[in-house]
């Protein structure tokens, strides 16, 4: 990302030897795909049951909107007052982590963990992984677009009842299985 006295002048992607005005400053940003393996967080599902849910996210910076990651996300300077590529990427990773937690909480709160009705065709976190993953990708894309970040893939990698109610819910599932087996 090239700036001329703090004003954005363009992005440069080519390798090799190139002449650039010496008054322009360049900020290097990696375009590689990155992974985020979010630790499971405790949220309430649609029915109010506490669950533990985690996600795996693959993301990268959009080539055409890389300037957004430089100007729209605040990066802290080191002791010498210079923002390094490493600190800028850490701030982007932190931004992605916070936004992914918020999107995961939002999606988990919209659906029940499991279907307790007789019809069995409602969308739940446990049985409808494709629909949930698509919705999660959509929510993450909305949140991360302001930083020029593209969501490559988002999946739920951990889903369980919270420890305080896990035993009770297991007994409930076993009882439902016994009742349905008798019918």
Q: Language-model features: where?
A:
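Short acidic, gly/pro-rich beta-turn/loop elements at beta-sheet edges
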Residues: 12, 16, 67, 164
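Long, charge-rich amphipathic alpha-helical coiled-coil "stalk/tentacle" segments
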Residues: 164-183
């Amino acid at each position: 990302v090239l700036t001329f006295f703090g004003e954005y002048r363009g992005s440069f992607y080519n390798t090799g030897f190139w002449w650039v005005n010496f008054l322009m400053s360049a900020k290097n940003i990696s375009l590689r795909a990155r992974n985020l393996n979010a630790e499971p967080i405790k949220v309430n599902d649609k029915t109010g049951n506490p669950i533990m849910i985690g996600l795996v996210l693959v993301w990268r910076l959009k080539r055409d909107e890389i300037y957004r990651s430089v100007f729209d996300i605040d990066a802290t300077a080191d002791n010498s007052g210079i923002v390094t590529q490493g600190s800028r990427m850490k701030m982007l990773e932190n931004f992605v982590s916070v936004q992914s937690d918020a999107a995961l909480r939002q999606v988990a709160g919209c659906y029940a963990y499991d279907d307790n009705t007789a019809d069995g065709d409602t969308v739940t976190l446990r049985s409808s992984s494709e629909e949930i993953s698509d919705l999660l990708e959509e929510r993450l894309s909305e949140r991360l677009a302001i930083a020029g970040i593209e969501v490559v893939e988002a999946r739920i990698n951990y889903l369980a009842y919270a420890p305080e109610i896990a035993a009770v819910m297991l007994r409930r599932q076993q009882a439902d299985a016994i009742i349905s087996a008798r019918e």
